[in-house]
């Protein structure tokens, strides 16, 4: 008996008008994730995954490229407005927001959600170079 051909079902992308861009800017890398209002990830990109390795990974330009790639990944969802949440002290904080703005998103709100300890763990010792 011949098997019936299996048809690939086309996934329907849900349309989302508002999204949240989570930017994690560390000293070594920048991670950009765009989610819907409920927190479901729609797309993400990193500076390291965008082809930058080593010390070039921690540059504002690498963060800008990561933001552009993340914006391209979520274009099919129809997002128009973005709320931006920035975490971390890294060099990619500003350039990521500028790249998302240039990609055609309307940025409605920018929030800094960097975790600040209330005198928690002891920090590492100072570097001697």
From Swiss-Prot:
One of the record's GO molecular function terms: structural constituent of ribosome
SUPFAM superfamilies tied to this protein: Translational machinery components
PROSITE patterns in alphabetical order: RIBOSOMAL_S11
One example of a Gene Ontology biological process annotation: cytoplasmic translation
GO CC list: cytoplasm; cytosol; cytosolic small ribosomal subunit
Further details from the record: Has been predicted to contact the N-terminal domain of IF-3 based on footprint studies; exactly how IF-3 interacts with the 30S subunit is controversial.
Family the UniProt entry places it in: Belongs to the universal ribosomal protein uS11 family.
Subunit structure and binding partners: Part of the 30S ribosomal subunit. Interacts with proteins uS7 and bS18. Cross-links to IF-3. In stalled ribosomes contacts ribosome rescue factor SmrB.
PANTHER family reported for this sequence: 40S RIBOSOMAL PROTEIN S14/30S RIBOSOMAL PROTEIN S11 (PTHR11759)
NCBIfam families membership: PRK05309.1, uS11_bact
This protein's name: Small ribosomal subunit protein uS11
Classification of source organism: Bacteria, Pseudomonadati, Pseudomonadota, Gammaproteobacteria, Enterobacterales
Name of the coding gene: rpsK
């Amino acid at each position: 008996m011949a098997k019936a051909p299996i048809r690939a079902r086309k996934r329907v992308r849900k349309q989302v008008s508002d999204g949240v861009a989570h930017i994690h800017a560390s000293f070594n890398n920048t991670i950009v994730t765009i989610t819907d209002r409920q927190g479901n990830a729609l797309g993400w990109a990193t500076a390291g995954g965008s082809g930058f390795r080593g010390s070039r990974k921690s540059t504002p330009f690498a963060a800008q490229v990561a933001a552009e790639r993340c914006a391209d990944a979520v274009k099919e969802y129809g997002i128009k407005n973005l709320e931006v949440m920035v975490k971390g002290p890294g060099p990619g904080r500003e350039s990521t927001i500028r790249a998302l703005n240039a990609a055609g998103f309307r940025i409605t709100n920018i929030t800094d959600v960097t975790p600040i300890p209330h005198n928690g763990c002891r920090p590492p010792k100072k570097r001697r170079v």
